[in-house]
Structures are given as structure tokens and as C-alpha cells.
Amino acid sequence: MSMQDPIADMFTRIRNGQMAQKVSVTMPSSKLRVAICEVLKAEGYITDFAASGDVKPVLEVTLKYFEGKQVIDTIERVSRPGLRIYKKKDELPKVMGGLGVAIVSTSKGVMTDRAARNAGMGGEIIGYVA
């Protein structure tokens, strides 16, 4: 059976891995998943990630913990295949009053809501991380 929403699957694997105190989680790789991991790493939500494999690329995400507690409190999908959510630059949400980040897919690539606001761009709200 094919996967209906690969990004929601990615977020679920990360959430489940952290709740189970796993060191890392693996998943099928794609350009969008790698771009999301770059944002998560830059914001300090994951330790590292690595994509490997030619025939079936695999993405391994190394999870991050602070004093034994998971760093990611909530990670949720906003825009989904059945209901895409697009926002203009002025309408970009602030997650938890600016403490979390919204991951936004813009014409210049995947970035945080802060970076998109500074660049004066809107886009599709992929998800929230806090």
C-alpha cells in the first residue's frame, strides 16, 4: 500500500521515536524531507540527519534530548494532501508566541516562518514544531 502523506509519516516517526527515547529514526528519503530536516537541525530540534542509498534512499534522523527529556514537545502537520494551507507573508502564524516554528514551503525553498517573514514571502504551511 502506498503512503498517502509522507510528511505526516515523517512527523509521526520523529514523535514516536522521541517518546520511545530512541537515538535515531529511519524513513524513506526525499528532497522535501531532507529540506525539512535542514530546518529542524538549524533550529536545534534534531542533532543530525543523513541520507544514504541509491536505489531506495533512506533518511536517518538523530534525535535530540536535553537532560533526558525530548527537545520536540509538539510536531504536527498543518497543510495536508486533502486540504492545503497557504498564507501570505502578513498572515504567517507565530507558533507558541514565537517560541516554536512553523515550517513553510516557499518559492525559495523550505524555511521557518521567521525567515519567510524576513524575506517577505508567504507559502504553504507544512507544519508546526515546538
Swiss-Prot record:
GO terms for molecular function: rRNA binding; structural constituent of ribosome. It holds the Pfam family Ribosomal_S8. It comes from Alteromonas mediterranea (strain DSM 17117 / CIP 110805 / LMG 28347 / Deep ecotype). The keyword Mitochondrion does not apply. Part of the 30S ribosomal subunit. Contacts proteins S5 and S12. Keywords: Ribonucleoprotein, Ribosomal protein, RNA-binding, rRNA-binding. SUPFAM superfamilies: Ribosomal protein S8 (SSF56047). GO terms for cellular component: ribonucleoprotein complex; ribosome. One of the primary rRNA binding proteins, it binds directly to 16S rRNA central domain where it helps coordinate assembly of the platform of the 30S subunit. One of its GO terms (biological process) is translation. This is Small ribosomal subunit protein uS8.
